Amino acid sequence: MRHAVSWFEMPVTDIDRAVAFYTTILGTRLAGIAEADGRRYAMFPAEDGVSGAIVQGEGYVPSTEGTLVFLNVGDVLQPVVDRVEAAGRQVLLPRMHMGEFGVAAFIVDTEGNKVALHAMA
């Protein structure tokens, strides 16, 4: 199946801190930190479908404005929201019902990005 999105990049200012945060809340490892063209990046798992990376480099500025990336957190949302709160991060919207499309929560990551977490329950 063809996806409307093929890749995403989320800007970070401290890639080591961001890798630790996403590893903790998602319960999965990001690919090791790589470097290319003056940027440092770590990729999210890409087993099925679309993936992306967190990227540190010139011109990559974290923000709560603009495009909102929805990360697939598996079947159940609440345990991931709990890990975000335990990590001391802000939960902007703890649970938003999306009808047949599941549920989502909006958070602010360690870098200042607004990110959505998506699950079916």
What residue spans do the PLM features occupy?
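Core segments of cupin and vicinal oxygen chelate
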Residues: 2, 9-51
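Active-site beta-strand termini and strand-to-loop segments that position acidic
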Residues: 44-48, 107-110, 120
